[in-house]
């Protein structure tokens, strides 16, 4: 999978830079079954982890960044707007409270998928937070929650800037 070094977004133009091993090896009758990125975190049965709601985002990068900044959720990713967002992959969310955090411009698409989750999850909602706070430019870029989290300087970044100004 190719990522832009400056933005952290996937490279999709001039072509999608994803290479599947089964395609390269030309495996006959291969049936791929995708899972949610971070799904293994759901098997942690500790009281702290089992009580946390699940947050689902599109990108694996976004799940990692959000997990660093926001510890209140178990962050999972579908691997794209459509990714593994299907009833089979969502079965692992049985009995969980789930909040979807779609990228800008994908909120309505993900809202349409709520009934699929409501049949499995204890509770399922779709956040429109980004749509409410985004500028038109941010919306046109299709930013995600990680992009917003990374816009703010962290305390460590501020400290480094102060050291650079006052050696």
Where are these regions (language model features)?
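Replication-associated primase and helicase/ATPase modules
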Residues: 4-10, 46-48, 53-57, 68-69, ...
